[in-house]
A protein has these predicted regions:
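Hydrophobic scaffolds flanking metal-cofactor catalytic centers in soluble metalloenzymes
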Residues: 5-8, 27-30, 39-93, 312-320, ...
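Iron-sulfur (Fe-S) cluster-binding segments and ferredoxin-like electron-carrier domains
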Residues: 36-64, 105-124, 348-364, 394-405
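Cofactor-cradling patches in redox/metallo enzymes
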Residues: 110, 191-273, 310-323, 331-422
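Short, structured patches in soluble enzyme cores that scaffold and shape functional sites
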Residues: 191, 278, 305-307
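Short cysteine clusters
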Residues: 28-34, 38, 97-103, 107, ...
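Iron-sulfur-cluster electron-transfer modules
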Residues: 15-25, 55, 59-262
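C-terminal amphipathic alpha-helical segment
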Residues: 284-327
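Immediate flanking context of iron-sulfur cluster ligation sites
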Residues: 14-32, 83-102, 245, 330-340, ...
Length: 422
């Protein structure tokens, strides 16, 4: 690594050094309490998968260049130079962490390893060593926001074709069961690309008599996955600007954990509220705006709490409220939602597909064991494993196949739509 590259990377590092970040970097006592809290370490007990080790990869560079002792005494506190070897270590640290923050729940000092790992991801971007796939997906999202008028006709053609599928689930008096560009709508729904994220949601909104409109943009924020703050902001602002232009009162995010957390926590103070679709479904049930076949699902049902929606987003009671309405045999797994095991698919790992599949399956053994231990399901039970996150759904499907669990992995929103009654 040449000096100009190193200097550029250290400038990026320095830009992340808020007071909170400095506390995280300087507080660790090496107590090790966080170590067994990580799903990767619990599944594969190797030191390099401990949260403290991941943080230490970043911390040693911090000591070398941002602490007087490290500059004067190069060997102090295992201070380490930022070089090509360090970049490889940063890459492993960054992309074996899903950002689930389970370790933070156990840390006596509340050190946020995910925030420390965000430095690693930013340095990788600066060095051109980040996963190319994630950067490409983030760039495509940014480009879509800059050329929305060009994609509108094709998007609307696709939406009109989906409307017949919505009507198969719930009859609508509206000319368009999937409304778009409705200024003054109460709700802007931000979906993912694909019928599975649009059709069930539209059926439930129409059943509730909602005044809603569909966003032109998909919810997922690939800028957040790759750890690029500028692209994260650009992708987020597409939706914020659309919501402001349409003067909606609420932005509802589909079953996508990172999309929900980014919109909820990073959009700043806005004239609209932000909700997950799970919160909206629970609200409809409490207000009597929709009716479901109560206890109509007789198969055993287990629920996986997505980390970004539950532990990092606070949505824990609503999915259980819905499931206890839907299911005759709902089985709670332990530990409780704040301490639930991560599925192992977050942080961009699922988006990397086959590239990360082997690691994802090995690191998710603790999740598979948790499901078996508390679900108490036999393959012949045809039990349902429900979740409210696209990444989790994909990862849990992979886990189900890899560990031969014999489960039927479903989206919670689809279960609600399937159970609608007049």
């Amino acid at each position: 690594m040449d000096e100009s590259t190193r200097s550029k990377l250290l400038t990026l590092f320095e830009g992340k050094l808020t007071r909170a970040m400095e506390v995280y970097l300087e507080t660790c006592s090496r107590c090790g309490i966080c170590t067994p809290a990580c799903h990767a370490y619990a599944s594969m007990p190797r030191a390099r998968y401990s949260p403290a080790h991941r943080a230490e990869v970043v911390r040693r560079i911090y000591k070398k260049y941002f602490k007087a002792q490290g500059r004067i005494l190069p060997g102090w506190g295992q201070a380490k130079p930022l070089d090509d070897t360090a970049i490889e270590e940063l890459k492993e640290a960054a992309y074996t962490c899903t950002g689930c923050r389970r370790c933070m729940m156990y840390c006596p000092f509340g050190i946020d390893t995910q925030q420390i790992v965000s430095i690693a991801k930013l340095l990788l971007i600066g060095a051109g060593a980040e996963p190319e796939t994630l950067t490409m997906l983030a760039d495509m999202s940014v480009a879509k926001g800059q050329n929305v008028d060009a994609i509108k006709p094709r998007f609307l053609d696709g939406i009109r074709r989906l409307e017949t599928k919505v009507l198969e689930r719930w009859k609508s008096e509206s000319a368009h069961p999937i409304p778009t560009e409705v200024e003054g709508a109460d709700m802007l729904y931000v979906a993912l690309a694909g019928a599975h994220s649009i059709v069930p949601a539209a059926a439930v909104f129409n059943a509730a008599g909602e005044n809603w409109t569909l966003s032109f943009f998909e919810a997922v924020n690939f800028g957040a996955f790759v750890g690029d703050p500028a692209k994260t902001k650009l992708i987020l602002e597409r939706i914020v600007d659309e919501a402001l232009r349409l003067k909606v009162r609420e932005v509802v995010i589909c079953e996508c954990g990172t999309a929900y957390r980014v919109m909820k926590q990073l959009s700043g103070k806005q004239p609209f509220s932000v909700s997950s679709i799970t919160e909206v479904h629970a609200r409809y049930l409490r207000e009597g705006r929709i009716r479901l076949r109560e206890k109509g699902i007789t198969r055993p049902v287990i629920y996986h709490d997505p980390c970004q929606i539950a532990r990092n987003g606070g949505v824990m009671d609503d999915p259980r409220y819905i499931l206890k309405k839907l299911c005759a045999d709902y089985r709670e797994i332990s530990p409780e939602p704040n301490y639930n095991w991560c599925c192992g698919g977050g942080g961009g790992l699922v988006a990397l597909g086959e590239e990360t599949l082997d690691f994802r399956m090995k690191s998710s053994k603790i999740k598979a064991d948790q499901i078996v231990a508390y679900g108490k399901c036999k393959p012949e039970d045809n039990a349902i494993l429900a979740t409210a996150c696209e990444n989790c759904h994909t990862q849990l499907g992979n886990i189900n196949t890899h560990y031969k669990l014999g489960l039927d992995v479903q989206f919670l929103s689809s279960m609600v739509a399937d159970a609608l009654v007049e």
